[in-house]
Curated annotation (Swiss-Prot):
Binds 2 heme A groups non-covalently per subunit. The gene is MT-CO1. Its EC number is 7.1.1.9. Component of the cytochrome c oxidase (complex IV, CIV), a multisubunit enzyme composed of 14 subunits. The complex is composed of a catalytic core of 3 subunits MT-CO1, MT-CO2 and MT-CO3, encoded in the mitochondrial DNA, and 11 supernumerary subunits COX4I, COX5A, COX5B, COX6A, COX6B, COX6C, COX7A, COX7B, COX7C, COX8 and NDUFA4, which are encoded in the nuclear genome. Mg(2+) binds at residues 368-369. It comes from Myxine glutinosa (Atlantic hagfish). Belongs to the heme-copper respiratory oxidase family. This is Cytochrome c oxidase subunit 1. Cu cation binds at residues 240, 290-291. PROSITE patterns: COX1 (PS50855), COX1_CUB (PS00077). One of its GO terms (biological process) is electron transport coupled proton transport. SUPFAM superfamilies: Cytochrome c oxidase subunit I-like (SSF81442). InterPro entries: Cyt_c_oxase-like_su1_dom, Cyt_c_oxase-like_su1_sf, Cyt_C_Oxase_1, Cyt_c_Oxase_su1_BS, Cyt_c_oxase_su1_dom.
Length: 517
């Protein structure tokens, strides 16, 4: 019974729970790796005494956080749990494929971790650029294992994407049109489309890299008529949509959290929010070369990618101001999910502003591969995606588990994390402006002050992570029932109680639209 429930599950709630547990586990690995990085950089001089190992840790940190923490939790965890319940579907369209999507991830993570343990590890950075990643600069099977790991994670995501697209389009309850589905469902749909269109390009790129390494092809080797810049174009055609894949489900989560804790019955500008996500998804595919301003492109090409990148700020601004308008005039409940959501809006906006700075090709030539870029993407990931995950976890925890979180501890956790991540990443803007490059294990003494502060912030965040583990343990051990009056019972995912029954919407459900004149 136990084996068949958890290993052969076809229930979207159980698979969502597996994804959440897997993501939490991977998140702890990724956090441990980041603490090693910040410890190495906590003062001038060397700690690890091995730059190849340092770069391997950086590469693993990126892959683990992106493919095994953020994506499984947001798309696999929240997506599986909530999408069928929000559209009144009994389950996902392809329940067994859903199970396979999950079970491809643990082997993928094992391959990635084993790539660090054999030979000298894959010290390529998460971009895996040739010629650094070719068979000459990286001998041994490490990069090949990392490539196979990416293949498995990619297949998992593509299957999941097909499943979500089919479910959302075909399994909505009768009379529910696209413009009735909640914003979180919109965000998962757009994310799934982005995955479906971008991952095959990554698969092509890393497969060509694999044959370059092992079968003597020269796709990316100039000596045989290839071009390493081709790899960069292929990688970033996936890589840029990928960063929107990481943040879009967060947008959906924040829309739900902000609406409920502002005492509103719907978010401000529903249609604008949905169209803004579609615009972000579309624009995300036509700006990839802004990651490549330093490889030598024509001035016209640079002008196009600069302006196209800046245009993404418009739909993003629509979303930020719609969240603020949702809060405006509301009866705000200052509970942990709302704190995370407000932190998200503020810090994601800061990250967006540094993104506008970097979109200028002339400025990016100076700032490329410095800590300014690290600060920028950690503001949108470590304080965008992660804050959104935390907002969603605190908000839907009673739904997933049937127990309530201790609000005092949750608020303490928020303030510790808020302090920690800002102390970690804000000084990195100054380091980048002063010219400190990325992916180096040591630095001149002039950079030590900001690095010390940054590493202290990392320790603060680490304490916050330990407190989160305590909070979740405390909730399960205390077994407090959530107060039904404090739950958003008029939202479809909550109508089956906390936790919901194993099967929901077993009979066809019906949606009645009340049009208010």
């Amino acid at each position: 019974m136990y084996l068949s429930r958890w290993f052969f599950s076809t229930n979207h709630k159980d698979i969502g729970t597996l994804y959440l547990i897997f993501g939490a586990w991977a998140g702890m690995i990724g956090t441990a790796l980041s603490v090693i990085i910040r410890t190495e950089l906590s003062q001038p001089g060397s700690l690890i005494n091995n730059d190849q190992l340092y770069n391997t840790i950086i590469t693993a940190h990126a892959f683990v956080m992106i493919f095994f923490m953020v994506m499984p939790i947001m798309i696999g965890g929240f997506g599986n749990w909530l999408v069928p319940m929000m559209i009144g579907a009994p389950d996902m369209a392809f329940p067994r494929m859903n199970n396979m999507s999950f079970w491809l991830l643990p082997p993928s993570l094992m391959l990635l971790l084993s790539s660090s343990l054999v030979s000298s590890g894959a010290g390529t950075g998460w971009t895996v650029y040739p010629p650094l990643s070719n068979h000459i600069s990286h001998m041994g099977p490490s990069v090949d294992l990392a490539i196979f790991s990416l293949h498995l994670a990619g297949v998992s995501s593509i299957l999941g994407a097909i499943n979500f697209i089919t479910t959302i389009i075909n399994m909505k309850t009768r009379s529910m049109e696209m413009y009735h589905i909640p914003l979180f469902v919109w965000s998962i749909l757009i994310t799934a489309i982005l995955l479906l269109l971008s991952l095959p390009v990554l698969a092509a790129a890393i497969t060509m890299l694999l044959t370059d390494r092992n079968l003597n092809t020269t796709f990316f080797d100039p000596s045989g008529g290839g071009d390493p810049i081709l790899y960069q174009h292929l990688f970033w055609f996936f890589g840029h949509p990928e960063v929107y894949i990481l943040i879009l489900p967060g947008f959906g989560i924040i829309s739900h959290v902000v609406t409920f804790y502002s005492g509103k019955k719907e978010p401000f500008g529903y249609m604008g929010m949905a169209w803004a996500m579609m615009a972000i998804g579309f624009l995300g595919f036509i700006v990839w070369a802004h990651h490549m301003f330093t490889v030598g492109m024509d001035v016209d090409t640079r002008a196009y990618f600069t302006s196209a990148t800046m245009i993404i700020a418009i739909p993003t601004g629509v979303k930020v101001f719609s969240w603020l308008a949702t809060i405006h005039g509301g009866d705000i409940k200052w509970e942990p999910p709302m704190l995370w959501a407000l932190g998200f809006i503020f810090l994601f906006t800061v990250g967006g502003l540094t993104g506008i700075v970097l979109s200028n090709s002339s400025l990016d030539v100076v700032l490329h591969d410095t800590y300014y870029v690290v600060a920028h993407f950690h503001y949108v990931l470590s304080m965008g995606a992660v804050f959104a995950i935390m907002a969603g976890l605190m908000h839907w925890f009673p739904l997933f588990s049937g127990y309530s979180i201790n609000k005092t501890w949750a608020k303490i956790h928020f303030w510790i994390m808020f302090t920690g991540v800002n102390l970690t990443f804000f000084p990195q803007h100054f380091l980048g402006l002063a010219g400190m490059p990325r992916r180096y294990s040591d630095y001149p003494d002039a950079y030590s002050t900001w690095n010390v502060l940054s590493s202290i912030g990392s320790m603060v965040s680490f304490v916050g992570t330990i407190i989160l583990m305590f909070i979740i343990w405390e909730a399960f051990s205390s077994k407090r029932e959530p107060n039904p009056l404090s739950l958003p019972l008029y939202n479809p995912e909550w109508i089956y109680g906390t936790p919901p029954t194993f099967h929901t919407f077993e009979n066809p459900s019906y949606l009645k639209i009340i049009k208010k004149e």
